[in-house]
């Protein structure tokens, strides 16, 4: 029997590519062949992507008022459409699955124009611009969170909650459980700033931890994703405060870092929020203020309602406020453990399998 084929189209950031990778692995486990189309940025996240082929296509965002940039974006997307049409014509996928981002636009446009079954997965709690264009005609709209704003009325009957597919190391951290906190034992803090590290976290969190009372400060072990230009200052701040800290722009083994952590501090991107819930960790989130449709604030809605996290918006994210909040949380291990349990209850470790089942069902007519 010839394996079914799924063409995955995903944008060029880790937020789009990591769920696409996990979904690809689940589809392959079900006997599918997978092929990926993305742009030049996406290729940075496509090393060892589980696919029979990885294709680079042209793509650009038309979200600009500059006429020259708008014309260039239109040209890039037109070229991308031609490239995607050629790939689809030769490979003949059974399904095209879009994971958001403008590199997904050409492939989804080809699917719609050629009558090929297609589906979309939205990582955030607000439907993104590209997914919004295709949602009404998609075979299904899968979402990472129960909340999904900006979903067209025509697509609501085909909305399914799968969760955001998580990488295997993250799922392994879930199995590790929440680490016990012994009296006077070490307290592990993990600070994540998205794929490039957030400036406000890189600069404010070290200052905040340096203000924590010495009795707690002496117990801290900090692992922080830090912007390259902020590394010297962050390291100097931690060293002056006597805090054991490891600061790097990127960490390869994030799963083990999650497993060891007692508290996570980070942005509220879909991947980070889903990982925090998937592993089951209390967290302090600082949503990106300029995120489209304020989707990062929407992403944490479920965890907020479950009393599993704190949310501090950028305008209030000062060293003094964060220091006081961290002191409050770390001084109450029972509350931390309770928050971890509440977060874990919202995790969806089977998200990749659920999405793969939905793709299967789209082809067989048994969508569940």
Swiss-Prot record:
The residues the record assigns to binding UDP-N-acetyl-alpha-D-glucosamine are 13-15, 124, 167, 195, 296
* Keywords associated with the record: Cell cycle, Cell division, Cell inner membrane, Cell membrane, Cell shape, Cell wall biogenesis/degradation, Glycosyltransferase, Membrane, Peptidoglycan synthesis, Transferase
* Gene Ontology molecular function: any one: undecaprenyldiphospho-muramoylpentapeptide beta-N-acetylglucosaminyltransferase activity
**Which superkingdom heads the taxonomic lineage of this protein's source?**
Bacteria
EC id: 2.4.1.227
Signal peptide start-end:
none
Which catalytic reaction applies to this protein?
A: di-trans,octa-cis-undecaprenyl diphospho-N-acetyl-alpha-D-muramoyl-L-alanyl-D-glutamyl-meso-2,6-diaminopimeloyl-D-alanyl-D-alanine + UDP-N-acetyl-alpha-D-glucosamine = di-trans,octa-cis-undecaprenyl diphospho-[N-acetyl-alpha-D-glucosaminyl-(1->4)]-N-acetyl-alpha-D-muramoyl-L-alanyl-D-glutamyl-meso-2,6-diaminopimeloyl-D-alanyl-D-alanine + UDP + H(+)
The UniProt entry, under Pfam families, shows: Glyco_tran_28_C, Glyco_transf_28
Give compartment(s).
Cell inner membrane
Q: What does this protein do?
A: Cell wall formation. Catalyzes the transfer of a GlcNAc subunit on undecaprenyl-pyrophosphoryl-MurNAc-pentapeptide (lipid intermediate I) to form undecaprenyl-pyrophosphoryl-MurNAc-(pentapeptide)GlcNAc (lipid intermediate II).
Please give the family membership noted in the entry.
Belongs to the glycosyltransferase 28 family. MurG subfamily.
Please report the name of this protein according to its UniProt entry: UDP-N-acetylglucosamine--N-acetylmuramyl-(pentapeptide) pyrophosphoryl-undecaprenol N-acetylglucosamine transferase
In which organism is this protein found? Maricaulis maris (strain MCS10)
